[in-house]
Each structure stands twice: as structure tokens, then as C-alpha cells.
């Protein structure tokens, strides 16, 4: 009986091999043929600007606190008009796992993920990107958003006076 079970195991293995031998290969010749990522693919991190051209990052440290591998570091500074900004901002892409938690934690939408997945360097120190390397000229996905224009609107205005906010309904006036 053990000979029959061995023969059956060999026949099953050969059947699986012959079944796959005539299929097309799934290997992609990467440098020559580049795959297009999915529409919602997240890869390289960039820092975006406001519509008026200023930096969006206010150095609140929420991105570095949300990062599970601690690859984001920065130093906060304050401008002449009292506006906070990041004096230096650094991301170590050799440690980054591209989870996107930093982009979700950013209250100013300064950190955004792009589908650029080609981050290859021979020296590991070249994977440490400074603020100048990360800043892009555009606003990214949220072109009309300006943190300082939207921050504190609900505090200074009565209910119903904010952007895209309806007037409150007086519930007592609806009663008979």
C-alpha cells in the first residue's frame, strides 16, 4: 500500500506541473516593462503647498507620532506673523512602510501619498529625504484647501454661518 500512495503523490505533483506548464508567465521584466499601479495605490510621500504658494506644514508633530516605524522627524519654528512652519522636515524612506498613517493624521493635508514607487538608491543615506526634496509646487489632491482660511471658522461665527452649513432648525417652533 505505501507504494500506491507514493505513486499517487508523484502523479498528483506531475499533474499540477503539466497543468501550469502551458500558461503564460506572470513575470514582469521590471526595468523595461513598468506596471501601472492601481488608482488608489499609495507610495512616495510629498509635502504640498497652499493655493497661495506657502507651506502647508505647521509642524504639529502628529505625523511623526502616528508613524509606527518612527521615520519622520522635524523641528518647529515660528514665522514673523506667528505662523508655525517646519524649519526642517526629514523622512527616512529606508524605514518607511508606506502605510499612509502620516497622511491621515495631518490636519493641514500637507502630507500626501503619490503612486511613485521607484525609490531605489545604492547608498542607504540617499533614501533620507529633506524638506526641499519633498516639497512640490502644486497643491496636490486638495487644491482649494488652505488651513489658515478654514481653521477656527466655527468658533468665530454663529451656527449656520459657516461654509456649507445650513441654518439650525428651531425644534420648539415645530411643536403644536
UniProtKB/Swiss-Prot annotation:
Binding site for [4Fe-4S] cluster 2: 67, 96, 99, 102
PROSITE patterns assigned to the protein according to its UniProt record, in alphabetical order: 4FE4S_FER_1 (PS00198), 4FE4S_FER_2 (PS51379)
GO biological process, one term: aerobic respiration
Co-factor note (free text): Binds 2 [4Fe-4S] clusters per subunit.
Cofactor requirement: [4Fe-4S] cluster
Protease listed as a keyword: no
Entry membrane topology: Peripheral membrane protein
EC numbers for this chain: 7.1.1.-
Domain 4Fe-4S ferredoxin-type: 45-77, 87-116
Reaction equation(s) it catalyzes: a quinone + NADH + 5 H(+)(in) = a quinol + NAD(+) + 4 H(+)(out)
GO MF entries: 4 iron, 4 sulfur cluster binding; iron ion binding; NADH:ubiquinone reductase (non-electrogenic) activity; quinone binding
Enzyme class: translocase
Keyword annotations of the record: 4Fe-4S, Cell inner membrane, Cell membrane, Iron, Iron-sulfur, Membrane, Metal-binding, NAD, Quinone, Repeat, Translocase, Ubiquinone
A GO cellular component entry from the record: plasma membrane
Coiled coil: none
Biological function: NDH-1 shuttles electrons from NADH, via FMN and iron-sulfur (Fe-S) centers, to quinones in the respiratory chain. The immediate electron acceptor for the enzyme in this species is believed to be ubiquinone. Couples the redox reaction to proton translocation (for every two electrons transferred, four hydrogen ions are translocated across the cytoplasmic membrane), and thus conserves the redox energy in a proton gradient.
Family the entry assigns: Belongs to the complex I 23 kDa subunit family.
The protein's assembly and partners: NDH-1 is composed of 14 different subunits. Subunits NuoA, H, J, K, L, M, N constitute the membrane sector of the complex.
The protein's name: NADH-quinone oxidoreductase subunit I 2
Species for this entry: Geobacter sulfurreducens (strain ATCC 51573 / DSM 12127 / PCA)
Gene it is expressed from: nuoI2
